[in-house]
A protein has these predicted regions:
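Phosphate/pyrophosphate-binding loop motifs in nucleotide- or prenyl diphosphate-using proteins
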Residues: 1-176
Length: 176
């Protein structure tokens, strides 16, 4: 029988990819735990929206966040074993998504209050989680320098999620 529990974390430590162990309340664990939360919230967004284009974008972002999370969950040895990392291509893809969505949704005329419909509200929850991730990466970078691409991707991600929420809010069938 395959077990998902190992009992190795019962004393408050967890293993990084590469073999080293750190405390479960370490900022690195907080950061990749936030990535995990965000991936799950994006699953809620995916299940909530009826827009095929947004669903495709959400799925792609989830896959990319797994790559980002793997890098955060790796020690120096593990980093050398990663097959994929976040790069300029992923950042550019988010920028194109943002530009396309903002052109489609039109200019902002006032502050956006989340809740116009369930899909946009869920995207705004994901946006705030991505902002938390960005804050954690900024703090983590001071003690454990991160690659610039990770910080840039997390910065663009919250804007991408905002732009996706705007698409949901401007749909003809959006609630008033």
């Amino acid at each position: 029988m395959y077990r998902i529990y190992t009992r190795t974390g019962d004393k408050g430590t967890t293993a990084l990819y590469g073999g080293s162990r750190i405390e479960k309340d370490h900022i690195r664990v907080e950061a990749y735990g936030t990535v995990d939360e965000l991936i799950s919230q994006l699953g809620v967004c995916y299940a909530t929206t009826r827009d095929a284009g947004l669903r495709e974008s959400l799925h792609h972002i989830q896959q990319t966040l797994f790559v980002l999370g793997a890098e955060l969950a790796s020690d120096a040895r593990g980093l050398t074993r990663l097959r994929q990392t976040i790069g300029e291509e992923e950042i550019t893809a988010l920028e194109r998504l943002i530009d396309r969505n903002m052109a489609e949704s039109g200019p902002l005329k006032q502050f956006v209050i989340p809740g116009k419909n369930l899909a946009s509200a869920q995207l705004h929850v994901a946006r705030t989680q991505s902002r938390r991730l960005e804050r954690l990466l900024t703090a983590m970078d001071r003690a454990h320098p991160l690659r610039d691409a990770l910080k840039r991707y997390s910065n663009r991600l919250s804007d991408a999620l905002f732009s996706m929420a705007r698409i949901e809010e401007t749909r003809p069938d959006a609630c008033a």
